[in-house]
Curated annotation (Swiss-Prot):
One of its GO terms (molecular function) is structural constituent of ribosome. GO terms for cellular component: cytosolic large ribosomal subunit. InterPro entries: Ribosomal_bL19 (IPR001857), Ribosomal_bL19_CS (IPR018257), Ribosomal_bL19_sf (IPR038657), Translation_prot_SH3-like_sf (IPR008991). The gene is rplS. NCBIfam families: rplS_bact. GO terms for biological process: translation. Keywords: Ribonucleoprotein, Ribosomal protein. The keyword ATP-binding does not apply. This is Large ribosomal subunit protein bL19.
């Protein structure tokens, strides 16, 4: 029984991933989430930028929590990974943390709440090669469509 459920969830997740591929991100990363907002009859996309403080759940029930400071007040929002209101996620910067849940940030203010940026130890040539390979893969994908 659970095998069938797991298989159906995997199929649905693959179908959603086809339309909208989310980047790999983890707690500590600063992300910009493109959220679809409906006001009356109009629908628009709004950016919500903050630090990912947690990822929870698995399969279609996977969520991530993003925390930002708005007008001096901490605001947290939980987004389902496979929700249709999430148009896309962009990783702004990678954070260096040693925990999976960063709830301790709730009690910190100002500079104490900052997260160190993860350094990329690859050489410039390696980064350029990776970028070129990604561009070629994207071009091949576009040509196939």
């Amino acid at each position: 029984m659970t095998d069938i459920i797991r298989q159906l969830e995997a199929e649905q997740a693959a179908k959603i991933e086809e339309k909208r591929k989310l980047p790999d991100f983890q707690p500590g990363d600063t992300v910009r989430v493109q959220v679809r907002v409906t006001e009356g009859t109009r629908t628009r996309v709004q950016a919500y930028e903050g630090v990912c403080i947690a990822r929870s759940g698995a399969g279609l029930n996977e969520n991530f929590t993003v925390r930002k400071i708005s007008y001096g007040e901490g605001v947290e929002r939980v987004f389902p990974v496979y929700s249709p209101i999430v148009e896309g996620v962009e990783v702004v910067r990678r954070g260096k943390v040693r925990r999976a849940k960063l709830y301790y940030l709730r009690g910190l203010t100002g500079k104490a709440a900052r997260i160190a940026e993860k350094k990329d130890n690859r050489t410039k040539a390696e980064r350029a090669a990776d970028k070129l390979a990604a561009a070629k893969a994207e071009a091949a994908k576009t040509a196939a469509e």
